């Protein structure tokens, strides 16, 4: 492994720009001055002086020399200059992070499958060679112009020769894509890479990161919010890990579930693959061989046969001599090598084109296993070639990239695989394709080599091939490698055994959760409403950041908002998932227990931007964030619940909370059916609620009529009554003052409680924490005063809270009023958050003389207003009671007719002031109260006022 120490090598290249920077150096885009080939040169800093950097760079160099495969970035050469190591790679146009930024709502399903299939093939090749990547994430997945995916950055890769479950370094893998065993410091193996694949599958599908935790413990909490509790073995590891000393394990009783999260986004087959990739117990997690033979990849396996051959060559494109069999390939490698930037695939032996045509038979030579074998053998070591020659060679080389194994050891392993495959391939007609056929061949029906693939593939593959094209999976992952993988899988699977139970639990809870906790699925937003449209619309609409962005009208602005919203979103998300579930179910405490103010007990409420770890992604991600968070995929939902539960994220959180709550109320009040409809249309539905602005009165009536608790999911979704489809934006109203204003306008009705938050959202956003505290205190006092004054006033206080709680608890409540109110408020606040303040002040003045006083410290004015305007406020509250159906006690004081009579704006003013103050102060307290409350409609409001959650407690007491 000698690295030439050539001082003038860099003189051969013209530097075109900087592709990226990392901890170990910089990546430059360069053009070879003679061949004009575009390459990426990774320049390590201080390779000689820094032992850690040196070890990492040499490890990466060794791995890359060993791993030659079509879906692994090609190392062209390595050299030293002035004590620094330079690695010359093929240039690939972009990475998946940038792709997700371009497509914030996710990638089309067929492309998702294609990318995941290629990624699994690359990982399969790594695992076949006992290498675990350990840092699989979107920015380490390069995507060429013709959609060929290449795995790069092996700086954290590790050789598992010591054993699959050796206890390696814990701090590897970007947090969001880190498996539970890595987070807990448990022994791990190849299954850690499979977990990352599952996370990326979800992210590609809806544009949002699946588990965006902001710390190790928050990551565990975020994972459990979706997948359910960890196995008991992992729980023990948590308590025995000194890193988590003194922390309570972040248990979640009502997980969202992958089904609900990706309802209407992923089909059942792909969802099954994802669930098996995201098994909490690594022993139960699918490994590459099982994935490649999964029914969802039938088409890919079939296409892979011919393209995989081309792909094989591509891996060998290094020498394109192999491809020289197709002289065009050899020539194009030389000529197109400069075009690499344009088409790396082509460069790679100009197999790029055939490869691009993976779906196609690819090269004629590839179509004939013979050509593939011949072309492949020249490219790589003959040892490798020989092993692949047996019949599956060509396919193995092409599909399995066996020829990529330049090292004799790799050739050996490849040979072994080939042999394994060969015997089976002999079964199939085209032994030469065996390896590549292992997948493609596995489908005897699908391609000429399907029988081979069947023979060359693992038994499961064969079975699958019989049934479908599943067997084709092995194409790029050689069937032998699959077999080998199977062996390694066995070793890996030995490590854990509890995940099944936990998963079963999670799944069981998930269905119910979907029903009862759409809010947690907010994102998903409610399995009931999920629709394909929701997937696309929701992404843009649902993400809180997305909404805010919409308000701002830019992805960039979104990005800024994304940070805020992200923080809020994150807060929201975990809580959203958890609290919403807990709200709708009987376990509000759990969500509260962790998220009173946090998305999770461990969240700082400032979730990293979509990819905080990626500078580039963060910027672009703003879009993605919108989409991802907005989808209600859990991020937005989480953020919403958190915001509702706590004002911790500072200024933004309270408004967000308010908005989310108001939307919840609105949604629940609007009418279950209408809510479901909206949820289903996710984007369009929310548009409807937005368009419903004028229908607030009706919705108020609906609220009366529909005391049934709305789904939490719907409650979270409703926050986006805007036509923008920025449902999450409303939830994330804190991000954009306009959102809060929207909420406020929506909250003009008594149910619109969040409106107050939006009011103060402009102010509170700037200094929401202070306002919150003041408002909380003032509101608390006002609540007490109201209680003392008369039950009517307390009733007015509690209706908001109750309504909110009701809406939250009654995710399925079919009261449409909240939505309607919200649209009005939204229309008002959307236009002007600040003006809304003044307007509201005016409205409050008209409805309650004291309301205007509470413009800034809404809560304090509310206090006065509530006490002074107990009648008007009470009236409003009765309305809200009737509408909410949760404040039945209050409803006594105010007839239901009153809501109909009252204008949404009028009712909201007095009602809103108190409710807003509550929502702002209650954000967190609300969640607590929800947890404390026993029922959505008939909660005992006996709780004493809490300084932290004065609004909710006061409301409860007043209701009592």
UniProtKB/Swiss-Prot annotation:
Gene Ontology BP term (one): regulation of postsynapse organization
Name of the protein this chain belongs to: Cyclin-dependent kinase-like 5
Known role: Mediates phosphorylation of MECP2. May regulate ciliogenesis.
Membrane-traversing stretches: none
Consequence of substituting residue 793 to A: In DEE2; uncertain significance
Chain positions found as Phosphoserine: 407, 479, 720, 761
Post-translational modifications reported in the UniProt record: Autophosphorylated.
């Amino acid at each position: 492994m000698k690295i030439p120490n050539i001082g003038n090598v860099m003189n051969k290249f013209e530097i075109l720009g900087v592709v990226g920077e990392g901890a170990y150096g910089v990546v430059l885009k360069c053009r070879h001055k003679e061949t004009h080939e575009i390459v990426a040169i990774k320049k390590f800093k201080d390779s000689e002086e820094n032992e850690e950097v040196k070890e990492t760079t040499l490890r990466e160099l060794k791995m890359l020399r060993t791993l030659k495969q079509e879906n692994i970035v090609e190392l062209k050469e390595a050299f030293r200059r002035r004590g620094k190591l330079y690695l010359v790679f093929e240039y690939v146009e972009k990475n998946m992070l940038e792709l997700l930024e371009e497509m914030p709502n996710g990638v089309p399903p067929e492309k998702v499958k294609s990318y995941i299939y290629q990624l699994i093939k690359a990982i399969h090749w790594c695992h076949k060679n006992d290498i675990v990547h350990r840092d699989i994430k979107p920015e380490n997945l390069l995507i060429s112009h013709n959609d060929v995916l290449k795995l790069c950055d092996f700086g954290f890769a590790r050789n598992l020769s010591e054993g699959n479950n050796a206890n390696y370094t814990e701090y590897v893998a970007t947090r969001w894509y880190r498996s539970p065993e890595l987070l807990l410091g448990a022994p791990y193996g190849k299954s850690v890479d499979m977990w990352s694949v599952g996370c990326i599958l979800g992210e590609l599908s809806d544009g949002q990161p699946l588990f965006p935790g902001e710390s190790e413990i928050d990551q565990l909490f975020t994972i459990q919010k979706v997948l359910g509790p960890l196995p008991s073995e992992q729980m023990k590891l948590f308590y025995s890990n000194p890193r988590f000393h003194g922390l309570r394990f972040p248990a979640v009783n009502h997980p969202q579930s992958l089904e609900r999260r990706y309802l209407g986004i992923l089909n059942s087959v792909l969802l099954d693959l994802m669930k098996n990739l995201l098994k909490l117990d690594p022993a139960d997690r699918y490994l590459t061989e099982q994935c490649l033979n999964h029914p969802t990849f039938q088409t890919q396996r079939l296409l892979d046969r011919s393209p995989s051959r081309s792909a094989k060559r591509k891996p060998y494109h290094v020498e394109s001599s192999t491809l020289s069999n197709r002289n065009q390939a050899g020539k194009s490698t030389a000529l197109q090598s400069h075009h690499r930037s344009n088409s790396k695939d082509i460069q790679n032996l100009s197999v790029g084109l055939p490869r691009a045509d993976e779906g196609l038979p690819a090269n004629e030579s590839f179509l004939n296993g013979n050509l593939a074998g011949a072309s492949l053998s020249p490219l790589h070591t003959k040892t490798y070639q020989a092993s692949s020659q047996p019949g599956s060679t060509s396919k193995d080389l092409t599909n399995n990239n066996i020829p990529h194994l330049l090292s004799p050891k790799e050739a050996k392993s490849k040979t072994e695989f080939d042999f394994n495959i060969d015997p089976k391939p002999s079964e199939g007609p085209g032994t030469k394709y065996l390896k590549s056929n292992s997948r493609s061949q596995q489908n005897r029906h699908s391609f000429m080599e399907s029988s081979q693939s069947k023979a060359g593939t693992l038994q499961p593959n064969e079975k699958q091939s019989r049934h479908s094209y599943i067997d084709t999976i092995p194409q790029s992952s050689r069937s032998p490698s699959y077999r080998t993988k199977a062996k390694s899988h066995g070793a890996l699977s030995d490590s854990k055994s509890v995940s099944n139970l936990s998963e079963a639990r999670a799944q069981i809870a998930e269905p119910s959760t979907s029903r009862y906790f759409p809010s947690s699925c907010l994102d998903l937003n409610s399995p009931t409403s999920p629709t394909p449209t929701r997937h696309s619309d929701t992404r843009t609409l649902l993400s809180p950041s997305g909404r805010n962005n919409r308000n701002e009208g830019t992805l960039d602005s979104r990005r800024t908002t994304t940070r805020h919203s992200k923080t809020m979103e994150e807060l929201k998300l975990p809580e959203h998932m958890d609290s919403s579930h807990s709200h709708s179910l009987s376990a509000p405490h759990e969500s509260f227990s962790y998220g009173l103010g946090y998305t999770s007990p461990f969240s700082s409420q400032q979730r990293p931007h979509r990819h905080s770890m990626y500078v580039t992604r963060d910027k672009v991600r703003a879009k993605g964030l919108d989409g991802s968070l907005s989808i209600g995929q859990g991020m937005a939902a989480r953020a919403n619940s958190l915001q509702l539960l706590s004002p911790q994220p500072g200024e933004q959180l309270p408004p967000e909370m308010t908005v989310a709550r108001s939307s919840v109320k609105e949604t629940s009040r609007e009418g279950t059916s209408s809510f479901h409809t909206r949820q289903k249309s996710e984007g369009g539905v929310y548009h409807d609620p937005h368009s419903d602005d004028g229908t607030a009165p009706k919705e108020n009536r609906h609220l009366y009529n529909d005391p049934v608790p709305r789904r939490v999911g719907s409650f979270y979704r409703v926050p986006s009554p805007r036509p923008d489809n920025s449902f999450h934006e409303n939830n994330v109203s804190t991000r954009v003052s306009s959102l809060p204003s929207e909420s406020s306008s929506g909250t003009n009705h008594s149910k619109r409680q969040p409106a107050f938050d939006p009011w103060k959202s402009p102010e509170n956003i700037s200094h929401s924490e202070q306002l919150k505290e003041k408002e909380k205190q003032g509101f608390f006092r006002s609540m007490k005063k109201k209680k003392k004054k008369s039950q009517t006033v307390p009733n007015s206080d509690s209706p908001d809270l109750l309504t909110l709680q009701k809406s939250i608890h009654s995710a399925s409540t079919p009261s449409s009023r909240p939505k309607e109110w919200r649209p009005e408020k939204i229309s008002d606040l959307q236009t002007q958050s600040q003006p809304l303040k003044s307007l509201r002040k005016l409205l409050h003045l008209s409805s309650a003389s004291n309301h205007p006083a509470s413009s800034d410290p809404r809560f304090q004015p509310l206090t006065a207003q509530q006490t002074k305007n107990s009648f008007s406020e009470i009236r409003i509250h009765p309305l809200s009671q009737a509408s909410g159906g949760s404040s039945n006690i209050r409803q006594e004081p105010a007839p239901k007719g009153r809501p109909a009579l009252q204008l949404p704006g009028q009712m909201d003013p007095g009602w809103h002031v108190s409710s807003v103050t509550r929502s702002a102060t209650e954000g967190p307290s609300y969640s607590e109260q929800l947890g404390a409350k026993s029922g959505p409609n008939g909660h005992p409001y006996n709780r004493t006022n809490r300084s932290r959650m004065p609004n909710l407690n006061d409301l409860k007491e007043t209701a009592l």
